[in-house]
UniProtKB/Swiss-Prot annotation:
Belongs to the class-II aminoacyl-tRNA synthetase family. Phe-tRNA synthetase alpha subunit type 1 subfamily. Keywords: Aminoacyl-tRNA synthetase, ATP-binding, Cytoplasm, Ligase, Magnesium, Metal-binding, Nucleotide-binding, Protein biosynthesis. It comes from Chlamydia trachomatis serovar D (strain ATCC VR-885 / DSM 19411 / UW-3/Cx). PANTHER family: PHENYLALANINE--TRNA LIGASE, MITOCHONDRIAL (PTHR11538:SF41), PHENYLALANYL-TRNA SYNTHETASE (PTHR11538). Binds 2 magnesium ions per tetramer. SUPFAM superfamilies: Class II aaRS and biotin synthetases, tRNA-binding arm. This is Phenylalanine--tRNA ligase alpha subunit. Its EC number is 6.1.1.20. The gene is pheS. Mg(2+) binds at residue 257. GO terms for molecular function: ATP binding; magnesium ion binding; phenylalanine-tRNA ligase activity; tRNA binding. It catalyses: tRNA(Phe) + L-phenylalanine + ATP = L-phenylalanyl-tRNA(Phe) + AMP + diphosphate + H(+). It comes from the Bacteria. One of its GO terms (cellular component) is cytoplasm. The keyword Lipid metabolism does not apply.
Amino acid sequence: MTIQEELEAVKQQFSCDVSLAHSSKDLFDVKVKYLGKKGIFRGFADQLRKYPIEQKATVGASINACKQYVEEVLLERGKAVLAKEEAEEFLKEKIDISLPGSEEAALGGKHVIKKVLDDVVDIFVRFGFCVREAPNIESEKNNFSLLNFEEDHPARQMQDTFYLDPTTVLRTHTSNVQSRELARNKPPVRIVAPGECFRNEDVSARSHVIFHQVEAFCVDKDISFSDLTSMLAGFYHIFFGRKVELRFRHSYFPFVEPGIEVDISCECHGAGCSLCKHAGWLEVAGAGMIHPNVLRKASIDPEEYSGYALGMGIERLAMLKYGISDIRLFSENDLRFLRQFS
């Protein structure tokens, strides 16, 4: 076998050895086998001494070329193996952030007002109403004029309403959704509108400058007052999980005719308490048949269509459902109080 054949055989064996080397230790063993002090290429160096001087240059060049090939392959293969080992080591040391910490973090919960608000909206959605919202900052037109409030109505006065400028207010009710939606949607319309409201009132156990309200309104052909009272009875039955006694009293609201106040029997069962002011009843909603003027302002013919609207305070419902006597507790951020409902 010539020296060239020996070198070719060495290259083939080397390629096989390198392909089987999957770690730095394996590669080191291959390097020692071929390039070590007692390695294969050391043997070729010993053979070179036996060649005539005129052949040494040619044979030596062939040996060096093969040796250089081995060194280059070992270098490239070494880089790949090292990168693989570093990646594996990184994965071993990686912190599993999905594991729980040494202490469990306390989870929050829905505020009682948010909880009641969601419950109310869910009931109306089950009744076929669509949820719509409107801005807290509203034009006087949408908050009052389109809802049949006269220019000199007391609700428009500074002592009852927060004015941002002469024509812009913080909405006093979520009825601004009604004026907006009736202007852009033609009957049939069934909408429930949740949100915050603002009124310039004294803060007490029963009233606050900021409160939450849900308005629901329906406009279609042949809507009657009995549809309204049936809706109210069905809603309170589901909300409280029992049949409740309701009382309807005639009342005046500019945007409905006739208008009613809706009272619910107090949990004191007529015995009298601070919540109901010893009356045995609690006012929970205002409602009525949508005034023809409101329909006309929305370009809806009151001779063809009719509708009802109702608005209820969420704080009042929460107070009734959970036996809370002071509306101020909802905004005082007392965790001892709030955690009872989370």
